[in-house]
UniProtKB/Swiss-Prot annotation:
The gene is LRP2BP. Disulfide bonds: none annotated. SMART domains: SEL1. It is found in: Cytoplasm. It comes from the Eukaryota. This is LRP2-binding protein. Transmembrane segments: none annotated. Interacts with LRP2. It comes from Macaca fascicularis. TPR repeats lie at residues 60-93. InterPro entries: LRP2-binding (IPR052323), Sel1-like (IPR006597), TPR-like_helical_dom_sf (IPR011990), TPR_rpt (IPR019734). The lineage of its organism: Eukaryota, Metazoa, Chordata, Craniata, Vertebrata. Sel1-like repeats lie at residues 94-126, 134-169, 174-207, 208-243, 244-278, 298-333. PROSITE patterns: TPR, TPR_REGION. It holds the Pfam family Sel1.
Length: 348
C-alpha cells in the first residue's frame, strides 16, 4: 500500500502568507486594494512581487514563503531551489526538502536523502523545529513501513507513529493516528480494538479516512459492538465530506437492503468518476489514500453494473452493465473478483 506524506504543519507564528501579510501591513499595502476581481494567477504574481521586496530587505521568512508558494502551485523545481538555499536557516524548508526528495517532487526520487532530512528535524534541539517533529516522525514511520530509504521494519514504523500520534493530541500528527488505525486492522494478527481506538481519535480530530473506517467497524462489529445506526451516521457524513470509499460502501449497503433506486442514483455518480484524473485530484483534496478511493469507485461500478444487468431500479441495459463491470475490474481486480465470487454463490 502506497502511503502519502504528512503536509507541512502550520507555523505557530504564521500559518499562511495572508496571516504573514496581516502582520506586515506597511509592506503589504495591496491588502487594502479590492482583489475580488483578481484571477488566481494575478494574486500569485502579486504575492511573488511583494515577497521579493521583503527578501531584498533580508526577511528570511519571506524567502521560505516564496518557496512554499511555489510548492503549493506545483512548481516543484523552483520550490526545491528556494528551500535548498535556506535549509540551514529554516527548519520548515528542511522538512519540505525531506518530503520532496522522498516523493520525488521537483527532483529525482531519493528516499535516503528524504529520510535524512526528516531525521534532522526529529533530532533537532531547536525550539523552532518543535512543531514539525510529530509530522517528521509520521514520515519516518512511513519510510520504515514501506522500506524505502531505510530497512523495512513494522516495529519501528509503529514506534514512530505512536510518538507522532501523541495519545490522540489534536496538535500532533492526525495522519499518524489514522495510520495506526489502518495498521492495527491489517497487521497479522489483527488488533481491532486498538484499530478502533485510533480511528476514533483521528476521526475526533477531523480525519476523513478514519471517519469512513469507523463506519465500517461499526457496521461489521469489528473492534466494537455492531451498531448499524452509528455506522450509517459515520458513513453518510464521511461520504458527504468526499470519502469515496465510504460512498462505495453505502452503495453496497443500499443494494443489500434492496433500496435499488437509491443505489442506482448514488452508484452512477461515483462510478462515473474519471479513473485517471479524478483519483489524484480527490486524494489531494480529501487526503484519503488513492487505493481506497479506487476501491470505492470499483464497488460503486460493480453494483451499478449489477443493477443495470438485472434492471433493478433502472431500465435493464446489459451493454452498459458490461462497461461498468469492466471498469470495476480495471480499478480493483481483486475486489471485482471477490464480488464476482459472491455473485456466483448467489450472495449478491
Amino acid at each position: 500500500m502506497k502511503l502519502t506524506s504528512e503536509k507541512l504543519p502550520k507555523n505557530p507564528f504564521y500559518a499562511s502568507i495572508s496571516q504573514y501579510a496581516a502582520k506586515n501591513q506597511k509592506s503589504f499595502q495591496w491588502e487594502k486594494e479590492k482583489t475580488d476581481h483578481y484571477s488566481h494567477a494575478n494574486l500569485v504574481d502579486k504575492a511573488l512581487q511583494l515577497l521579493k521586496k521583503r527578501i531584498l530587505k533580508g526577511d528570511t521568512l519571506a524567502y521560505f514563503l516564496r518557496g512554499q508558494l511555489y510548492f503549493e502551485e506545483g512548481w516543484y523545481e523552483e520550490a526545491l531551489e528556494q528551500f535548498e538555499e535556506i535549509e540551514e536557516k529554516d527548519h520548515q524548508a528542511t522538512y519540505q526538502l525531506g518530503v520532496m526528495y522522498y516523493d520525488g517532487l521537483g527532483t529525482i526520487l531519493n528516499s535516503e536523502k528524504g529520510v535524512d532530512y526528516m531525521k534532522k528535524i526529529l533530532d533537532s534541539p531547536c525550539p523552532k523545529a518543535r512543531h514539525l517533529k510529530f509530522a517528521a516522525a509520521y514520515n519516518l514511520g512511513r519510510a520504515y513501513y514501506e522500506g524505502k530509504g531505510v530497512k523495512r521494519s513494522n516495529e519501528e514504523a509503529e514506534r514512530l507513529w505512536l510518538f507522532a500520534a501523541d495519545n490522540g493530541n489534536p496538535k500532533a500528527s492526525v495522519k499518524a493516528q489514522s495510520m495506526l488505525g489502518l495498521y492495527y486492522s491489517t497487521k497479522e494478527p489483527k488488533e481491532l480494538e486498538k484499530a478502533f481506538y485510533w480511528h476514533s481519535e483521528a476521526c475526533g480530530n477531523g480525519n476523513l479516512e478514519s471517519q469512513g473506517a469507523l463506519g465500517l467497524m461499526y457496521l461489521y462489529g469489528q473492534g466494537i459492538r455492531q451498531d448499524t445506526e452509528a455506522a450509517l451516521h459515520c458513513l453518510r457524513e464521511a461520504a458527504e465530506r468526499g470519502n469515496v470509499y465510504a460512498q462505495g460502501n453505502l452503495v453496497e449497503y443500499y443494494y443489500k437492503m434492496k433500496f435499488f433506486t437509491k443505489c442506482v442514483a448514488f452508484s452512477k455518480r461515483i462510478a462515473d468518476y474519471d479513473e485517471v484524473h479524478d483519483i489524484p485530484m480527490i486524494a489531494q483534496v480529501t487526503d484519503c489514500l488513492p487505493e481506497f478511493i479506487s476501491r470505492g469507485m470499483a464497488m460503486a461500478s460493480f453494483y451499478h453494473a449489477r443493477c443495470l444487468q438485472l434492471g433493478l431500479g433502472i431500465t435493464r441495459d446489459e451493454a452498459t452493465a458490461k462497461h461498468y463491470y469492466s471498469k470495476a475490474c480495471r480499478l480493483n481486480p481483486a475486489l471485482a473478483d471477490e464480488l464476482r465470487s459472491l455473485l456466483i454463490r448467489q450472495r449478491i
